[in-house]
């Protein structure tokens, strides 16, 4: 009888330990939170994608190409570059229905904006879509074009003059400047 109570106690203690560890994983992002998130993201993002040598998202079957608008004074053009904050690493993925009149410009083409943005390397959300959306909602612009060229985990040296990411970014800006003025 006493052996039975000890075994029951250990089973209950183990269940409680697992339960509280599970709470810690969810609340405090303990291991294996990152592993679980990566597996979850594999199933959430169901599209055909292509990346370039910098790891930037250059094609996604989820992105719908549209005609690029002509530049005018009610068209905003925002450029985002740098590390993770501009590289599709934020938690919230914006969908087209959340971003009215927000356009993702990449490689001379325009797409209905949605997360992750073409031109950056992550597979999640970013801040630039929300900023563009607020500019449209407040009536500052009728439409906003966003250009994202962020690469997460890069050093400042890589973005410095003469280095690989600097050359890539200059090419992005040169391409953009043929059609638009950055506002």
PLM regions: where:
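N-terminal secretory targeting modules
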Residues: 1-127, 138
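Conserved SGNH/GDSL esterase-like catalytic core that processes O-acyl groups on lipids
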Residues: 111-182
């Amino acid at each position: 009888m006493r052996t039975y109570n000890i075994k029951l106690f250990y089973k209950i203690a183990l269940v409680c330990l697992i339960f509280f560890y599970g709470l810690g994983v969810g609340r405090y992002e303990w291991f294996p939170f990152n592993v679980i998130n990566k597996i979850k993201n594999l199933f959430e993002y169901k599209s055909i994608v292509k990346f370039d040598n910098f790891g930037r998202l250059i094609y996604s079957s989820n992105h719908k190409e549209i005609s690029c608008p002509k530049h005018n004074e009610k068209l905003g053009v925002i450029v985002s570059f740098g590390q993770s904050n501009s590289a599709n690493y934020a938690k919230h993925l914006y969908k087209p229905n959340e971003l009215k009149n927000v356009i993702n410009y990449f490689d001379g083409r325009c797409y209905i904006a949605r997360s992750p943005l073409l031109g950056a390397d992550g597979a999640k959300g970013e801040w630039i879509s929300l900023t563009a959306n607020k500019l449209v909602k407040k009536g500052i612009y009728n439409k906003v074009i966003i250009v994202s060229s962020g690469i997460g985990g890069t050093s400042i040296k890589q973005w410095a003059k003469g280095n690989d990411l600097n050359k890539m970014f200059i090419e992005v800006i040169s391409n953009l400047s043929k059609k638009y003025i950055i506002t």
